[in-house]
């Protein structure tokens, strides 16, 4: 039987994902692993939203979409546009690689008590003008602040820039953070 074990996931927990070929061995494998791991406090995990945001792990469809370029998402270093002959959008990617994006993913720290769920884009504002949007946010018990991922225009993406975030519970003061927390 083929098994694939991947050290991957959306947290700093250092877990593994196991993929089996065929479902008939899944339950037996599960029970065997849980029993063998019990003395070592091994258990099943799940994605951790807070750690995902603290670490700047982007969620496709939420923090980045097909509408974003790799450069906007901080992934430009993985694009080899010089050899991408025939690639649709190559010219645009070459231009952005040379000139830089006009907006980019940034870490944001939102002031105040815990924010509610970010179930829609929250506008990022400066003096009444929208300069970006928060796509993921959560209270971080480790850092005692609200951590967020947002797409911010280059005019306001420098670390320390003060902005306002229009949460569903009202306006919150925020600032662009130097980097993600973990």
Enumerate the language-model features and the residues they cover.
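Conserved, structured C-terminal
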Residues: 1-182
């Amino acid at each position: 039987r083929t098994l694939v074990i991947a050290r991957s996931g959306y947290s700093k927990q250092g877990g593994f994902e196991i993929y089996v070929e065929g479902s008939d061995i899944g339950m037996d494998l599960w029970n065997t692993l849980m029993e063998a791991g019990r003395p070592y406090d091994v258990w099943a995990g799940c994605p951790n939203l807070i750690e995902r945001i603290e670490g700047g792990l982007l969620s496709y469809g939420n923090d980045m979409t097909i509408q974003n370029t790799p450069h906007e998402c901080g992934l430009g270093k993985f694009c080899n546009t010089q050899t991408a002959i025939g690639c649709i959008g190559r010219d645009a990617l070459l231009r952005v690689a040379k000139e830089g994006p006009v907006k980019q993913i940034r870490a944001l720290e939102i002031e105040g008590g815990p924010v509610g769920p970010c179930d829609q884009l929250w506008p990022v504002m400066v003096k009444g003008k929208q300069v970006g949007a928060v796509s993921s946010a959560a209270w971080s018990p480790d850092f005692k602040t609200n951590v967020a991922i947002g797409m911010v225009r280059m005019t306001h993406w420098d670390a320390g820039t003060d902005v306002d975030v229009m949460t569903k519970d009202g306006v919150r003061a925020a600032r662009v953070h130097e980097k993600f927390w973990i």
